[in-house]
Amino acid sequence: MDNMMITLPLLILFLPLVSFIILIFFGKKLPRQGDWVAVGSIVATFFFALYLFIQMILEYDPGVSHGASFSWIDLDAFKIDLGILVDNVTVVMLLIVTLVSSCTHIFSLKYMEGDIRYSRYFAYLGLFTFSMNGIVLADNLISMYMSWELVGVSSYLLIGHWFEKDSAADASKKAFLTNRVGDIGFFIGIMLLYSAVGSFAFGPIFDSIATGNTITGMTLTLAGLGIFLGAAAKSSQFPLHIWLPDAMEGPTPVSALMHAATMVAAGVYMSVRLFPIFTPDALLVIAYIGGITAILASLIAITQNDIKKVLAYSTVSQLGYMILAVGTGVYTAAFFHLLTHAMFKANLFYCSGSVIH
């Protein structure tokens, strides 16, 4: 059973990457430009995630976790491991990501039919799903950061899918650059934690914070705020919320997958996963940012007359509620709302796509 709890997450992680590689190199030579490769691999990951979820329900243990890692860089004074962590939070999030991604792939079969870059579109969806699963499964900050950057790259490619339109090209660049601002803070936060603890892995960092031996006070607050800056950019929080409404220039299924259910939820997921690093001062800032975003975005939404922009600002507002919950210490409520919001907002985007199409 332990082997299954490692093997299936690895398949969930790498099957979309295999799909991406096949479609990039051979997509146009395959029947139907290889859309069946993309859909088949993603639907398979959903059933794997569903199996893990059922096992979690049947053998419920709040403290259970499984992991595997290997040494990537091993120098005398510097070591980086890459690995995965599978616990209850991971399994639930994997189920949501693979379910929404599967629905998006199936919806796209007709929505994107006849598109001039049909196979490339499905390839990029696979790359994004691989990247998002990498964030969910990461057991250390470096693994998470690498997947975090890949999510940024794949969002740039998908938002700018119709790059012949100036508005789509500009929106993809705006999203990419705005997220890089947050990623700088994320990287600084990671380095502050590593310089104090000497490890990128979640376990040693959390243990060090709990004992108060190596990192406390201002350093921990700054590290937490730096990491939250990355979450704020990815989850479109004030003042880095400006990219999400413009990102609606991408195909509507992309909006459902990335800008309603998964990519924008990555910042909330990271905040929940790394909650122990946030000091009371950092949590106060997080709560204020979330509250401002929730109110501001909802007020902007009522002034919009474009169906996708209304949904975009609604998404920003709902993400603000999640971040506010994290800031007030109720991270379980934030995670619950992340799951419910992913489902209903993705469906709203599918409905808007049907109206537009």
Question: Language-model features: where?
Answer:
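Transmembrane helix-loop-helix hairpins at membrane boundaries of multipass inner-membrane proteins
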Residues: 1-10, 25-123, 196-217, 242, ...
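Hydrophobic alpha-helical transmembrane segments of multi-pass integral membrane proteins
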Residues: 2-8, 16, 34, 141-143, ...
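Residue-level signal for short hydrophobic patches within transmembrane helices
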Residues: 7, 11-14, 18, 22, ...
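N-terminal signal-anchor/start-transfer transmembrane helix
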Residues: 13-27, 102-103, 232, 294
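Cytoplasmic juxtamembrane interface segments
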Residues: 18-38, 156-170
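Hydrophobic transmembrane alpha-helices and their helix-loop junctions in integral membrane proteins
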Residues: 103-144, 153-357
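Short phosphate-coordinating micro-motif centered on Lys-Gly-acidic
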Residues: 149
